[in-house]
Amino acid sequence: MRAVIQRVREASVTVAGEVVGAIGNGLLILLGVCHTDTAEDVELLAEKIAQLRIFSDHEGKFNLSLLDVGGAALVVSQFTLYADTRKGRRPSFTAAARPEIAAPLVDAFAAALRARNIPVATGVFGAMMQVALINDGPVTLVIDSAELRLPRRAGSRVDS
């Protein structure tokens, strides 16, 4: 399970001209589900995001979590996060979970955040959506549940 999280002042998602989800201060979470993801990935990622200290304290340091600031989350499913662009000019999405597997896991992820007392708004799974946001910072991170399982010394997927 892969999430692109953006710290926002506000964000909304529109489907067919109607706003279906909106938040104020918090995180926009673009969520991709891999064909190997399970409920364990849901819990691992939800816990990490809920506790991640990416909001500034009174000294301007990243010391506060989404929970600490009373922020909300806007969760938008996005299978394109599992695009494979290594070959050709058209991305392949074979690593992305099929909708019948992905949709329940996206719902479970939103529920896992709610269970941690985070207000959650969502997009519509499988719909063409327009996402609007005002970045705060900007602060944007990519978190992958598979990487969260690696030993800390294993390094990241991209060497600097």
Curated annotation (Swiss-Prot):
SUPFAM superfamilies per the UniProt record, alphabetical: DTD-like
Molecular function as annotated in GO: D-tyrosyl-tRNA(Tyr) deacylase activity; Gly-tRNA(Ala) deacylase activity; Ser(Gly)-tRNA(Ala) hydrolase activity; tRNA binding
EC number(s) from the headed UniProt entry: 3.1.1.96
Subcellular localization: Cytoplasm
Residue ranges of the motif Gly-cisPro motif, important for rejection of L-amino acids: 137-138
Top enzyme category: hydrolase
Keywords: Cytoplasm, Hydrolase, RNA-binding, tRNA-binding
Domain notes per entry: A Gly-cisPro motif from one monomer fits into the active site of the other monomer to allow specific chiral rejection of L-amino acids.
NCBIfam families: D-aminoacyl-tRNA deacylase
Name of protein: D-aminoacyl-tRNA deacylase
Gene: dtd
